[in-house]
């Protein structure tokens, strides 16, 4: 059997066993995708006994490529909501994440001083305990710069010992917090969805009768602050006639307007217009219809809604715009992106004409544009390879193969499309690539750790190393988790994403995502803290190495 065939076969075996382990539940809790790591350790242990070895370069490529796929698809998934999240709760989340990083750094110093743990060992344990491979590389580089090249190899051993238990510690922290606070996951998910919809311009409707005499005879576009209130006038009822208003429609006293917008904007507009009334303005039984259409025509990507001149040509109004699950109030300045879902109100023939303009080709939503994926991955790898020089540091910092693709994916997902290129990915395709990536990554990590795992575990102070790693992993997580839940009132699912992101741990994120399928809280908080945490995790071992090396 060729080297490639042997590698693929054994990693497939690792994936099968690991995924099976991950499905085993103990009191309703399972390792999930993290089981692949232990599948790798198990298979590697027995294969080593028979002298089976795999090519290191091949394994390294598979591991890094899997990680790139995982973080890139995560960025594409959460990108549309990431920047809004920064404005809403990002400061709090990042503060807690930095708290976790800071506590772990303090613990490294204490363990090094109290138990006289060699510097290369404690730095390796630190990197494994926080499940951060770039941290290991940064620590090895700085030790080499400081003249310790001959002892950096031991860092890898400390990393391998601490890494598996680093993942367990994160899952254990999530589980204990769930037990301590008697968390109802469904309730937490509902609260997150409700709060997120409110924060992200979740839309409501209101019917208002015009009673303000100052508005009589005015056109809609002449209303005070017409564009600033972020309200859509989707229907108007005059006597018994229902029709779709246009910007030049003249308003009369007694007209009833159907408004769409945020609750705050609706209330402000109601104070200007008149009184709220409980009157039906349904399109049922009339010549008007309400339809949902998807933007798929590349000719309208990046165009402002007003450039389509729908209100001038057609008896149609766009009452809502849904982008990546977030409902927005459409206005003339808003640009259209691939996958935007528009709520159209108007005559059937006019709605059909508008659908023809924007595309509404549902099958395109299931198609994957491969070119943007490889452009994004390539740009991400380039960004991760750019050295960042800071005064006083002998080694250039880098985002690496994990941080670079993530940052690029977040930006591209936020942009949405550039001419004919769009970075929308069907959820099924995104999930498939993400799961394949994390399985490849974990299978290789488990294989590398499993060969001499038991020997290392039972010798060379292996048990003590495990203890140090467990402290570095667990204490910052549980302390910050308790503080965030009690004083920060953080949603449990968001907290799980925070814990996973603070350790830059994809398996923990996969576990957190599995706590409540289909809820994006964990992924969103993970992506919110990941860029800053990755930067801190790369810098911290260098700072620790310099401080502890100088201190002797």
UniProtKB/Swiss-Prot annotation:
Gene Ontology annotations of biological process type: potassium ion transport
Name the UniProt record assigns to this protein: Putative transport protein HAPS_0158
Pfam families linked to this entry: Asp-Al_Ex, TrkA_C
Alphabetically ordered keywords of this record: Cell membrane, Membrane, Repeat, Transmembrane, Transmembrane helix, Transport
Topology class, membrane: Multi-pass membrane protein
Record-linked HAMAP family: YidE
Family membership: Belongs to the AAE transporter (TC 2.A.81) family. YidE subfamily.
Lineage top rank: taxon: Bacteria
SUPFAM superfamilies (alphabetical): TrkA C-terminal domain-like
Keyword Repeat among UniProt keywords: yes
Subcellular location: Cell membrane
Transmembrane portions of the chain: 4-24, 28-48, 65-85, 95-115, 157-177, 370-390, 393-413, 438-458, 463-483, 492-512, 532-552
Molecular function GO terms recorded: monoatomic cation transmembrane transporter activity
GO cellular component: plasma membrane
InterPro entries the record matches: AAE_transporter, RCK_C, RCK_C_sf, Transpt_YidE_put, YidE_YbjL
RCK C-terminal domain mapped to chain residues: 193-275, 277-360
């Amino acid at each position: 059997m060729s080297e490639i065939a042997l590698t693929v076969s054994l990693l497939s075996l690792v994936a099968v066993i690991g995924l099976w382990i991950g499905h085993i539940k103990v009191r309703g809790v399972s390792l999930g995708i993290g089981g692949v790591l232990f599948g790798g350790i198990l298979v590697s242990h027995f294969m080593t006994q028979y002298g089976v070895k795999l090519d290191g370069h091949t394994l390294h490529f598979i591991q890094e490529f899997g990680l790139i796929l995982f973080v890139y698809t995560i960025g594409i998934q959460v990108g549309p909501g990431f920047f809004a999240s920064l404005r809403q709760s990002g400061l709090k989340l990042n503060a807690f994440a930095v708290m976790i990083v800071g506590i772990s750094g303090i613990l490294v110093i204490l363990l090094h001083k109290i138990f006289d743990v060699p510097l290369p060992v404690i730095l390796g344990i630190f990197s494994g305990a926080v499940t951060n491979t770039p941290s290991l590389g940064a620590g090895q580089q700085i030790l080499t710069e400081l003249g310790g090249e001959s002892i950096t190899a031991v860092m890898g051993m400390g990393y391998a010992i601490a890494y598996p238990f680093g993942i367990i510690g994160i899952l254990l922290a999530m589980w204990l917090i769930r037990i301590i606070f008697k968390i109802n996951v469904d309730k937490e998910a509902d609260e997150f969805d409700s709060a997120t919809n409110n924060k992200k311009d979740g839309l409501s409707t209101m019917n208002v009768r015009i009673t303000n005499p100052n508005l009589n005879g005015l056109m809609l576009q002449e209303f005070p602050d017409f564009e600033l209130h972020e309200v859509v006038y989707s229907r108007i009822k005059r006597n018994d006639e229902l029709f779709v208003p246009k910007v030049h429609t003249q308003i009369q006293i007694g007209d009833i307007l159907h408004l769409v917008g945020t609750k705050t904007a609706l209330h402000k507009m109601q104070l200007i217009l008149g009184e709220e009334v409980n009157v039906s303005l349904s399109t049922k039984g009339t010549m008007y219809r309400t339809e949902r259409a998807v933007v798929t025509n590349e000719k309208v990507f990046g165009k402002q809604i007003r450039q389509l001149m729908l209100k001038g040509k057609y008896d149609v109004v766009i009452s809502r715009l849904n982008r990546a699950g977030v409902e927005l109030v459409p206005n003339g300045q808003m640009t259209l992106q691939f996958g935007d879902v528009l709520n159209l109100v108007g005559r059937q023939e006019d709605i059909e004409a508008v659908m023809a303009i924007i595309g509404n080709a549902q099958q395109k939503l299931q198609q994957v544009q491969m070119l943007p994926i490889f452009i994004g991955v390539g740009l991400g790898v380039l960004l991760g390879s750019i050295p960042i020089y800071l005064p006083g540091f002998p080694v250039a910092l880098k985002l690496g193969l994990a941080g670079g693709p993530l940052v690029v994916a977040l930006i591209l997902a936020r942009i949405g499309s550039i001419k004919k290129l769009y970075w929308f990915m069907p959820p099924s395709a995104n999930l498939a690539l993400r799961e394949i990536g994390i399985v490849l990554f974990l299978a290789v990590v488990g294989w590398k750790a499993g060969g001499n795992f038991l020997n290392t575990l039972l010798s060379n102070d292996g048990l003590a190393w495990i203890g140090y790693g467990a402290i570095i992993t667990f204490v910052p997580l549980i302390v910050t988790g308790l503080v965030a839940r009690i004083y920060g009132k953080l949603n449990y699912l968001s907290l799980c994403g925070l814990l996973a992101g603070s350790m830059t741990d994809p398996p923990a994120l996969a576990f957190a995502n599995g706590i409540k399928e289909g809820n994006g809280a964990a992924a969103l908080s993970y992506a919110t803290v990941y860029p800053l945490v990755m930067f801190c995790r790369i810098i911290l071992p260098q700072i620790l190495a310099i401080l502890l090396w100088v201190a002797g």
